[in-house]
Amino acid sequence: VSADVSDAVSIEIKPGAVVSNLLLGGGRYYAKTNTVNIKADQATIMAIYAGGYDQGQTTNTLTTDVDASVNGVKNVNMTLSKCTIPEGLGTGGGQGYTHTGTSVVTVTDSELGAIYGTLSNGYADDITVNMTNTTFKKQYNGSDIQYRELASINRGGVKNISFTFDGC
């Protein structure tokens, strides 16, 4: 099964919503998307992966170009306001050999367990993250995460990355 979305996909999470597991910007395995727009306001989302979930189940490798990638997102635009993300936010790449092109992520007045550029062998071309008035909390009810972490790469790779923190 495969999906190839040449247009934009928009995901909007409204105030009070709870995502009790993982939110994927892209899809699983053979799923490719041109643009993903994620907007969440006053929501609780256990974890977010900007790209997809490859899990090493496709023909992708760590160095597969985003245009040739069978699992990935070319453009990621993410805006999170007043959100709680207990297990963390992955701003580019994804799980397994997922590839993202350009990610632009804005986080304001939120609380996170961790933030990553790329995740678990994911790869990204460009990631820009702007965070304002955001805090990192060590322990969350319902989460096994026992630490705060900021990492540009959690295995995998990234060509260019920028994190900006204001009032955090």
Language-model features: where?
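Surface-exposed loop/turn motifs in large extracellular/passenger domains
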Residues: 1-21, 27-47, 52-88, 93-168
